[in-house]
Amino acid sequence: RNSCYTSSYRQPVSLVVEWVLIGGLAMQDKLHEIRVFENFQEELFETGHVIVTTEVVEKSLNYFGNAHGGYLFTLCDQVAGLVALSTGDYAVTLQSNINYLKAGHLSDQLKIEGLCVHNGKTTKLVEVLITNQEEKILTRATFTMYVTGSISE
């Protein structure tokens, strides 16, 4: 057991971590390794604009057979970092937000496109879209990147 507080009411909340049987299978049987950028292609790398493509593989699916949300988020986060690099700076994710709009499926061809909409000295704001081969938007994400140094230094 672990105690934590909710942010709004400061009431203690108990968290219990234990293996739960679901349909006769332990929860650990539902967990598996997720692969990201196993087969990516850099399509565009310009100042403030990056496009990477990849294919959804079996190792990137969730239990329901769709592209795992963590997989999609990681694709966005990696591209946001590449966008920061494209502006000449090293940066780390300071804050992020993602909206999942449609499911990705096995063998979908994904385009991950990042665009720097604010190129500041200490922070950058990067918008990232993931679209499929039908040009349907799967995710829309925003990343605030904190600049840790210049590539030229």
Residue spans for each PLM region:
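Intrinsic-disorder-associated, low-complexity terminal segments enriched in Asp/Asn/His/Tyr and depleted
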Residues: 2-5, 9
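Terminal targeting signals and extreme-terminal segments of soluble enzymes
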Residues: 5, 14-153
